[in-house]
Amino acid sequence: MDKKAARIRRATRARRKLQELGATRLVVHRTPRHIYAQVIAPNGSEVLVAASTVEKAIAEQLKSTGNKDAASAIGKAIAERALEKGIKDVSFDRSGFQYHGRVQALADAAREAGLQF
C-alpha cells in the first residue's frame, strides 16, 4: 500500500464515522503549494462554506501559499465565513493527514476565530 492509498483509507474510516454521527464537517485538504478548507453539510451533498489559498484575495495577502502562515489565514477565513452563515459547531475532518504542521495550524486558527470542534 502506497502513501496516498493509506491516507485515503484513513480518511474513509473517519468520514464513515462522521456520517453516522450526522455531523457538519470541516474538511481540510493540503497539497505542497496550497491548502483548502470546506464546511460540508451532514448529508455530504452540499458545501456550505469554502476557503483556500487559491483565492486571489487571500493569496495576495500571503508571502507563500504553502506554509503554516497560509494555513492559519485559511483557518481564520473559514471560521469567519462559517459563523456568518450561523455554523458554530463542526467536526474536524483532517482527510487522513497527520494532525501536525499546516493541518494543526489551520485547526488552531479556526478555533481561535470561534469555531467549536
Curated annotation (Swiss-Prot):
Biological-process GO terms, alphabetical: translation
Molecular function terms from GO: 5S rRNA binding; structural constituent of ribosome
Gene3D superfamilies named in the record: 3.30.420.100
CDD domains with a match to the protein in the record: Ribosomal_L18_L5e
Taxonomic superkingdom: Bacteria
GO cellular component term, pick one: cytosolic large ribosomal subunit
Family annotation (InterPro entries): Ribosomal_uL18_bac-type, Ribosomal_uL18_bac/euk
Segments forming a coiled coil: none
Pfam families for this protein: Ribosomal_L18p
NCBIfam families (UniProt xref): L18_bact (TIGR00060)
Free-text function comment from the UniProt entry: This is one of the proteins that bind and probably mediate the attachment of the 5S RNA into the large ribosomal subunit, where it forms part of the central protuberance.
Assembly with partners or alone: Part of the 50S ribosomal subunit; part of the 5S rRNA/L5/L18/L25 subcomplex. Contacts the 5S and 23S rRNAs.
Protein name: Large ribosomal subunit protein uL18
